[in-house]
Amino acid sequence: MGLSVVILAAGKGSRMNSNKPKVLQTLAAKTLIEHVVSSVEKLNPDNIVVVTGHLKEQVEDALQGRNITFVYQQQQLGTGHAVLQALPYLKEQKVLILYGDVPLISTEVLENLVDTTNDDDLGVLTAFVENPQGLGRIVRDKFGAVTEIVEEKDANDIQRQIKEINTGIYCVHKNLLQKWLPEIKANNVQKEYYLTDIITFAKADHVSINVTHPINEFEILGVNDRTQLASLERVWQRNVAEKIMAKGVSIADPNRFDVRGNLDVGKDCWIDINVIIKGNVKLGNNVVIGANCILKNCIIEDNVRIKSNSMVDGSIIREGAIVGPFARVRPECDVKEGAVIGNFVEAKKTILGKGSKASHLTYLGDSEIGANCNIGAGVITCNYDGVNKHKTVIGDYAFIGSDSQLIAPVNIGQGATVGAGSTIVKDVPADNLVISRARQRHIDTWQRSVKKTDK
């Protein structure tokens, strides 16, 4: 059974007060239309047609690389007119029609609509809502059959009391669209060609109208302004949080937790408030994430503690390691088992060996640090000469004293000790003590300068 999909994305979205089309506003770090496209792609349709209008180039760029046909609606003359523009690009099969600004629609709901609609039926997705203001109402006859869809602007007082609304999502064979779309008239307040008129044509042609409903009301909610966008963001995040908690993870406050990508979790993890997940993140078992942390494209293994106000990006934190508080782990780091990246430590493209510690106020860049090393406070690996980056290698069991600078490229041998306050420019052999600082002098005849005072 073949399927074509039409996504309507021509609207400007004036209430967004934005320089980009409404469908390119973001929810959970993805554009609204990307959410919709992702849902319909799982249906494996033969083709997807996106009808563009306002700033069409931006929409096409956002969906670049996907198997989509773009059709330009030069004049925004309504939903019926928009689908008419797509008609020549559709195959002789069922057509699923939906909107690019309804981001939470699920594949399951769409699949149910498609599967229950026969080739000679009209499938309509409707929903019952508490506040139908601004939405088209489903009008039924005394037998309960759908007779028409009335837009709010055209509805009378009785029709405005109806709670069942049109979601704007339909499934209908192309043959029926070819017959009905040219018959739509713009005889309404807006002077637009409403796709909803196909309900009337279906009744006149004795076409069966198949009505299905969404699993959750939020799935059919559209976005017209930034307030609605923020509301749907919280709905999305709450839904994600509940799925994560069902897998055995405790979240301190689901209302203060954001996933802007994909999170794979183990069991018995604890996630504190204001944690943000970006890209693809994997948590092992018994992981603790402190407040205000940001995790992006990283792997966190079992029994790791990420303390508050820390960032981990593009790196792997091995079992039992500790990061933070106030630490930043930049891309291409490998923090080995039991290692510590402490408070106000920044690491970039660095291997920190098993059991090694950089507990505070340190920069580790382009470094390879062995096991069981101690990196003192204020240590800096000076990796950049203004043109190129250079590597610092520190052997197992080395001790780097506080406030030392390691001028790369440089090697510190296994078991070597660097005295505090040293600037190291040459390799240090294994088990050596190296001190590079001025000798301390005492001058007992020195007098401090005294400021002149007004007489």
UniProtKB/Swiss-Prot annotation:
Location of region: Pyrophosphorylase: 1-226
Main location: cytoplasm
Pathway: Nucleotide-sugar biosynthesis; UDP-N-acetyl-alpha-D-glucosamine biosynthesis; N-acetyl-alpha-D-glucosamine 1-phosphate from alpha-D-glucosamine 6-phosphate (route II): step 2/2; Nucleotide-sugar biosynthesis; UDP-N-acetyl-alpha-D-glucosamine biosynthesis; UDP-N-acetyl-alpha-D-glucosamine from N-acetyl-alpha-D-glucosamine 1-phosphate: step 1/1; Bacterial outer membrane biogenesis; LPS lipid A biosynthesis
Sites where the protein binds acetyl-CoA: 377, 383-384, 402, 420, 437
Molecular function per GO: glucosamine-1-phosphate N-acetyltransferase activity; magnesium ion binding; UDP-N-acetylglucosamine diphosphorylase activity
The EC number(s) this enzyme carries: 2.7.7.23, 2.3.1.157
Binding positions (UDP-N-acetyl-alpha-D-glucosamine): 8-11, 22, 73, 78-79, 99-101, 136, 151, 166, 224, 330, 348, 363, 374
PANTHER family, sorted: BIFUNCTIONAL PROTEIN GLMU (PTHR43584:SF3), NUCLEOTIDYL TRANSFERASE (PTHR43584)
Record function comment: Catalyzes the last two sequential reactions in the de novo biosynthetic pathway for UDP-N-acetylglucosamine (UDP-GlcNAc). The C-terminal domain catalyzes the transfer of acetyl group from acetyl coenzyme A to glucosamine-1-phosphate (GlcN-1-P) to produce N-acetylglucosamine-1-phosphate (GlcNAc-1-P), which is converted into UDP-GlcNAc by the transfer of uridine 5-monophosphate (from uridine 5-triphosphate), a reaction catalyzed by the N-terminal domain.
Family per record: In the N-terminal section; belongs to the N-acetylglucosamine-1-phosphate uridyltransferase family.
Subunit-structure text: Homotrimer.
Name of the protein described by the UniProt record: Bifunctional protein GlmU
Originating organism: Francisella tularensis subsp. tularensis (strain FSC 198)
